[in-house]
C-alpha cells in the first residue's frame, strides 16, 4: 500500500543522507 511505499522511500532517503554525512566527515 501507500504506507509501505512511503516507508521504503524514507529508508532510501536516510541512507543517502547518511552517506553524504559520512563523506563530509571524511574530508
Curated annotation (Swiss-Prot):
Organism placement in taxonomy: Eukaryota, Metazoa, Ecdysozoa, Arthropoda, Chelicerata
Modified positions (Glutamic acid 1-amide) in chain numbering: 27
Xref: InterPro entries: Cupiennin
Subcellular location, record wording: Secreted
Listed name of the protein: Cupiennin-3a
One GO cellular component term noted in the UniProt record for this chain: extracellular region
Stated family: Belongs to the cationic peptide 04 (cupiennin) family. 03 subfamily.
Single GO MF descriptor: toxin activity
Source organism of this protein record: Cupiennius salei (American wandering spider)
Coiled coil segments of this chain: none
Entry keyword set: Amidation, Secreted, Toxin
Amino acid at each position: 500500500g501507500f504506507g509501505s511505499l512511503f516507508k521504503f522511500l524514507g529508508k532510501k532517503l536516510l541512507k543517502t543522507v547518511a552517506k553524504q554525512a559520512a563523506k563530509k566527515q571524511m574530508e
